[in-house]
């Protein structure tokens, strides 16, 4: 666990360092949300050794790239302050909200990220004044908007990422089963990103909004989070580099902060839609299961059994295949209810259904 934290934070910090424009802090800093997501998904990593390994990883990434040692300690303290406050607040949420599976989960996440970035900006804003001779309030605002963007675009991906086996299976099934028109939102999203770069202009970062919303109503939450991540990371770096428009002398920081906040608000739209869709799909799945299966034995309900049996018989008859049907009865079941009560009868039914399912499963498997 300690090595996992150190490796993840070190790699993410190096990536952020390489995105630093001249004279500014990193335009994309994934180390903080990556560390926060690791701790949320695996709370057992939140140990003194885990926090020390994260601190060492932050320091090592800055030092090997030539940063001043005292500045590095200050920046690391600011980063850890934001992550620690965010982790403590996320621990107060139910597990479903931590994995962004409820309609209000994105709202909770946004509020926690705001508080976490306020904590980190309070500690780190002085660095901006020392390094770049900016006003303290300007340094606070610049740090706050930058860190907030990083949290909003990275956390949803990291918190909803499925396991490697489930992700591989989902990708394979998606290629086999997804209808061709289901790829249209992804194509529209890619084209909108390319169009924003080619056309340019002050409003180019907003060109992908319709495509992102289309993806949000068509795809699972994790894939929507990936699209949002790609959009926001790309737009943040392009805006910070001045590709879309030239900054007015002396007003570059204000322009960058304004666009960063706009990107955050844009990202919240499709993420909220995807979160609501995920909650709706889960509810529909539970309702369908309640209709199709008996709540006690988890076997097919009478109506579902009759429908499936009728369809199976008709299909096998159409292909000239025979069908064997057997009926099973529990002897003296009424006596169990009369003598021991309906609770004992329910337990007997559950045990019988489980035993029957196990026997039939073995028979099917050979």
Region locations from a protein language model:
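Conserved long alpha-helical elements within nucleotide-processing catalytic cores of c-di-GMP signaling
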Residues: 288-292, 298-324, 331-358, 366
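Juxtamembrane non-transmembrane "cap" segments at the membrane-aqueous interface
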Residues: 226-234
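Short aromatic-rich membrane-water interface segments that cap or initiate transmembrane helices
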Residues: 137-149, 255-258
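Signal-transducing coiled-coil linker helices
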Residues: 207, 252, 257-296, 303-315, ...
